[in-house]
């Protein structure tokens, strides 16, 4: 996530003489990546990419806190200024507007604070606030809304304001949404609420807030507002993230809440907001401060061994320097004479620091990754042949392109209906925990459903398409899914023999010859269900299955589904030179009457193995129970005589009759 902050705003919290260029360079070296430092009039604007695990840096103050530690490591004095709140959080003496708050599940909202202001004057914010918001990428609206956005950028604490008079019954109930509920948000969008979304309803049951994401239109602050309810809180990050994913909608506030907001910083932000309301809105505090904080987090302690620090960093770093680095970052240390120490984590890092390695990462980045030695760790080098997958992918794609195929690229996710169309059980597939929509719920276990969907949208004769991509196979609850790279093609308007020829030619292109085509017998599998029972086959090479091809049951569409990883393992780049034969071949066609359930592959194999003189066997015609094979005879040492060919022919006829009960057609 990228944020934009002004140099002048940063220096309100950081006392230093470092230049903007130095700040950008050293912050990038030891903490967050500064993408750009841009001169804007008499100021500088930083564009900073904040890593997901560091929500404490999603604010001006958080970055100032980081820089106060980092800059002195480069010889640049820096000091973090204390957060001063001139007006402490207090309650009014006379006026006390009522507000009833009920939180149905404390885990939804770990900390809830609220206060009401009266006699609010709605007007534009001071110029400096407007400029800082606009240059940080947030539109200035009015003094009330701008306060919440301003403090979100400055302190990293999102907050929300309501028109108090629009909250019916002066009552707020924070709960999870139920099925079928909707809210009209501040952007005038009607949003159906997924089950389990955190919401707030008022005394009449109207939903007035899509918590952590955007407020409701029915409680917004407008130019007529006189009483404002300020609401500063934290939420369960997981619930906010899930809601954003299901709604396909995310705001600046949600981007912070879903990463985790420090509940200990809520009162600081509330105090700062109360001060700004009195100053910028001429408002009076008109209620008691509500602070619901039932389960404050327990103090987090992590054991750290200095020997482990040195082992992982690969250098000897003194105990004194380790202590100095960690204390400068806000950690509290309990040390003794041994190498062990107990480290108490500061509240703003509770979600980030859990194990000794987290602390070592902190030590390493402040010490300076650029100062660590670049020696490679000792290891045994094992020589192995690495398969060049991109090369073979390019080779296969080029071959298919020249044969008239078009490559398709489909989503890896499919819907339940697409799976059921090809008789794949959804419960046997990998379900995505947080799908983007109902159309993308499962990771596909095969490329076939995707290609069939493409074919249904492209109704035409002689369609030839293919896809080379991963499929994901569910194993068991205790095993990781299996990920396979598959090559799948779809052909319409052709014959079984031609599709078989494509598969054989493709494998020959990769140096895989003498494959065995066997009937596919597994009826209960996915392939057994979608393919025609007598027009499907399995490709075997060296006792390994390379894939399946066949005709679909319901229409004249052929599919081949090949295990690309296994194919590449069997590829052979070595091409043997074969001299052009000196002696001519003899070619003849033999027609046979074939009994039912006799496979052509068996016949061709029987013919080919009859004699070494037989160089090639092809099926050239098929009609009812008759098959015609073209047999090529050739001797590399002499010209064959008719008598020699006749002898081999008779041997073929006898062998087929004895083994397969096949008769020569008269």
Locations of regions flagged by a protein language model:
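Short flexible coil/turn linkers enriched for glycine and charged/polar residues
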Residues: 4, 40-42, 108-111, 402, ...
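Short amphipathic beta-strand starts and helix->beta connectors
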Residues: 28-36, 97-102, 213-214, 289-291, ...
């Amino acid at each position: 996530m990228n944020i934009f902050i002004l140099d002048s705003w940063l220096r309100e919290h950081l006392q230093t003489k470092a230049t903007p260029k130095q700040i950008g360079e050293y912050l990038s070296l030891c903490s967050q990546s500064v993408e750009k430092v841009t001169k804007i009039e008499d100021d500088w604007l930083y564009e900073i990419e904040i890593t997901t695990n560091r929500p404490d840096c999603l604010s001006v103050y958080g970055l100032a806190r980081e820089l106060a530690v980092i800059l002195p490591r480069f010889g640049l004095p820096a000091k973090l200024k204390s957060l001063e709140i001139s007006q402490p959080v207090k309650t009014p003496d006379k006026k006390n507007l009522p507000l009833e708050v009920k939180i149905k599940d404390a885990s939804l909202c770990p900390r809830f604070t609220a206060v009401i202001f009266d006699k609010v004057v709605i007007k534009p914010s001071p110029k400096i606030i407007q400029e800082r918001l606009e240059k940080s990428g947030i539109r200035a609206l009015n003094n009330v809304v701008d306060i919440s956005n301003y403090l979100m950028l400055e302190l990293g604490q999102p907050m929300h304001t309501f028109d108090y008079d629009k909250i019916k019954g002066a009552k707020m109930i924070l709960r999870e949404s139920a099925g079928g509920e909707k809210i009209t948000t501040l952007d005038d969008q009607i949003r159906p609420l997924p089950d389990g979304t955190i919401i707030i309803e008022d005394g009449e049951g109207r939903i007035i807030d899509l918590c952590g994401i955007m407020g409701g239109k029915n409680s917004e602050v407008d130019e007529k507002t006189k009483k404002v309810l300020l609401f500063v809180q934290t939420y369960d990050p997981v619930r906010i993230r899930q809601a954003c994913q299901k709604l396909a909608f995310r705001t600046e506030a949600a981007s912070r809440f879903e990463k985790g907001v420090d509940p200990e910083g809520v009162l600081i932000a509330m105090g700062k907001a109360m001060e700004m309301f009195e100053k910028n809105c001429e408002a009076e505090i008109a209620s008691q401060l509500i602070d619901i904080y039932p389960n404050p987090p327990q103090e987090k302690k992590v054991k750290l061994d200095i020997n482990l620090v040195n082992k992982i960093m690969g250098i000897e770093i003194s105990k004194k320097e380790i202590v100095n680095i960690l204390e400068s970052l806000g950690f509290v240390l309990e040390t003794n004479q041994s190498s062990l120490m107990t480290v108490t984590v500061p509240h703003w890092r509770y979600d980030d620091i859990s194990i000794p390695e987290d602390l070592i990462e902190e030590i390493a980045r402040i010490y300076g990754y650029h100062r660590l030695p670049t020696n490679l760790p000792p290891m045994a080098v094992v020589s192995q042949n690495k398969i060049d997958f991109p090369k073979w992918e390019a080779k296969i794609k080029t071959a298919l392109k020249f044969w008239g195929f078009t490559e398709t690229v489909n989503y890896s996710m499919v819907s339940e209906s697409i799976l059921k169309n090809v008789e794949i059980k959804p419960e046997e597939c990998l379900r995505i925990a947080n799908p983007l929509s109902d159309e993308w719920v499962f990771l596909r276990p095969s490329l076939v459903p995707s290609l069939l969907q493409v074919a249904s949208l492209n109704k035409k004769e002689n369609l030839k398409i293919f896809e080379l991509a991963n499929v994901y196979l569910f194993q068991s609850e205790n095993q990781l899914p299996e990920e396979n790279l598959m090559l799948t093609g779809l052909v319409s308007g052709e014959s079984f023999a031609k599709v078989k020829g494509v598969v054989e030619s493709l494998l020959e292109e990769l140096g895989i010859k003498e494959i065995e085509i066997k009937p596919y017998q597994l009826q209960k599998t996915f392939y057994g269900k979608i393919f025609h029972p007598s027009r499907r086959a399995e490709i075997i090479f060296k006792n390994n299955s390379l894939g399946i091809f066949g005709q679909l049951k319901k229409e004249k569409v052929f599919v081949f589904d090949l295990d690309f990883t296994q194919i590449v393992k069997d590829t052979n780049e070595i091409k043997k030179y074969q001299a052009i034969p000196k002696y001519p071949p003899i070619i003849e066609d033999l027609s046979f009457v074939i009994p039912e359930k006799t496979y052509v592959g068996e016949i061709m194999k029987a013919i080919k193995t009859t004699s070494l003189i037989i160089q090639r066997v092809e099926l050239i015609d098929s009609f009812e129970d008759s098959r015609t094979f073209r047999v090529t005879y050739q001797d590399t040492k002499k010209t064959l005589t008719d008598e020699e060919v006749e002898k081999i022919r008779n041997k073929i006829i006898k062998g087929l009759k004895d083994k397969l009960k096949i008769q020569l057609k008269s």
